């Protein structure tokens, strides 16, 4: 068996195409959706991620607000930047690029963002709304990467209702939110949330219809621990030095041999990543629409 590819770039292009008409309607009413990013320090991967997000925003005609602060920025200085963006009516979505330098309190920073401008969907208020709402429509921002992973499957005709999904990774950004989204009645999957401390992880993986891994441990998901026909999404990112070139290269959680047993597999990069960025744009547009309806 050779797995079919879950093409994140193609699915992301579909999401962006669906946003074009909504953005045009907002602009016609005098509202241009605006994305603001805050980057602290000079971490090269973070700079790349922020650059790609603004490229997406510019391609769609969104307004861009970039705040690049030095690594020694204090908590008070960072808070002041977030307060300024919260108060700016042209900004509809704010994203603080993480990780932050160790002297800064990431959780306090995320909580300081106006929940209505929470482009990443990670504010405690918005996560709380997700916890409390199992049945109804959710109008608050949703976490981009988990929604992107689910949309990537649904847009490829993968049925999730009644399926056993094993999520590897308990982080707020992906793992915990995935469980909340997948168990909503509109999806109706059964979820096992595992992590690097799970005893006999392989036993859980062998029972899975779908595996979504987001722990950042290179190639920890191996073919020998999966049943034939499983759907596998690789969300984890780790870095390894290439012994030949001396350069750092990106590796996912999923080993190459998994493609021989899976029915579908997401590449990394090129799988969930593009969907994360597309859903970020969607959250910004949704926030602008909420403002326009007031």
Curated annotation (Swiss-Prot):
Gene Ontology CC terms: cytosol
Binding site residues for NADP(+): 169-171, 196, 237
InterPro entries per record: Aminoacid_DH-like_N_sf (IPR046346), NAD(P)-bd_dom_sf (IPR036291), THF_DH/CycHdrlase (IPR000672), THF_DH/CycHdrlase_cat_dom (IPR020630), THF_DH/CycHdrlase_NAD-bd_dom (IPR020631)
The UniProt record lists the keyword Hydrolase: yes
Record-listed E.C. numbers: 1.5.1.5, 3.5.4.9
Domain of life: Bacteria
Pfam families documented for this protein: THF_DHG_CYH, THF_DHG_CYH_C
Pathway field: One-carbon metabolism; tetrahydrofolate interconversion
Alphabetically ordered keywords of this record: Amino-acid biosynthesis, Histidine biosynthesis, Hydrolase, Methionine biosynthesis, Multifunctional enzyme, NADP, One-carbon metabolism, Oxidoreductase, Purine biosynthesis
Gene3D superfamilies: Leucine Dehydrogenase, chain A, domain 1, NAD(P)-binding Rossmann-like Domain
Molecular function GO labels: methenyltetrahydrofolate cyclohydrolase activity; methylenetetrahydrofolate dehydrogenase (NADP+) activity
GO BP annotations listed: L-histidine biosynthetic process; methionine biosynthetic process; purine nucleotide biosynthetic process; tetrahydrofolate interconversion
Catalysis performed (reactions): (6R)-5,10-methylene-5,6,7,8-tetrahydrofolate + NADP(+) = (6R)-5,10-methenyltetrahydrofolate + NADPH; (6R)-5,10-methenyltetrahydrofolate + H2O = (6R)-10-formyltetrahydrofolate + H(+)
Subunit structure: Homodimer.
Role of this protein: Catalyzes the oxidation of 5,10-methylenetetrahydrofolate to 5,10-methenyltetrahydrofolate and then the hydrolysis of 5,10-methenyltetrahydrofolate to 10-formyltetrahydrofolate.
NCBIfam families: PRK14193.1 (NF010789)
Protein family membership: Belongs to the tetrahydrofolate dehydrogenase/cyclohydrolase family.
Protein name stated in the entry: Bifunctional protein FolD
Species name: Renibacterium salmoninarum (strain ATCC 33209 / DSM 20767 / JCM 11484 / NBRC 15589 / NCIMB 2235)
């Amino acid at each position: 068996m050779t797995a079919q590819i879950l093409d994140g770039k193609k699915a992301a292009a579909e999401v962006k195409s669906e946003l074009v008409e909504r953005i045009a309607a907002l602009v016609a009413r005098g509202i241009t959706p605006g994305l603001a990013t805050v980057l602290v320090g000079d971490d090269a991967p973070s700079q790349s991620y922020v650059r790609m997000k603004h490229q997406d925003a510019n391609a769609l005609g969104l307004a861009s607000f970039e705040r690049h602060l030095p690594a020694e920025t204090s908590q008070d200085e960072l808070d002041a930047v977030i307060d300024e963006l919260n108060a700016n009516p042209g900004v509809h979505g704010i994203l603080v690029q993480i990780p932050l330098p160790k002297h800064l309190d990431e959780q306090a920073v995320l909580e300081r963002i106006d929940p209505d401008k929470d482009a990443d969907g990670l504010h405690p208020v918005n996560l709380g709304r997700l916890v409390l709402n199992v049945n109804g429509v959710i109008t608050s921002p949703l976490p981009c990467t988990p929604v992107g992973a689910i949309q990537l499957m649904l847009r490829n005709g993968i049925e999730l209702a009644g399926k056993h999904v094993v999520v590897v990774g308990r982080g707020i950004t992906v793992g915990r939110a995935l469980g909340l989204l997948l168990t909503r009645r509109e999806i109706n999957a059964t979820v096992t949330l595992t992590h690097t401390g799970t005893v006999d992880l392989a036993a859980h993986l062998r029972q899975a219809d779908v595996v979504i891994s987001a722990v950042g441990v290179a190639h920890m998901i191996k073919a020998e621990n999966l049943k034939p026909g499983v759907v596998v999404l690789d969300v984890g990112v780790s870095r390894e030095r290439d012994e030949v070139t001396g350069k750092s290269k990106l590796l996912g959680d999923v080993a190459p041999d998994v493609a021989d047993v899976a029915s579908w597999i997401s590449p990394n990069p090129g799988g969930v990543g593009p969907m994360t960025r597309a859903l970020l744009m969607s959250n910004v547009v949704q926030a602008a629409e909420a403002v326009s309806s007031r």
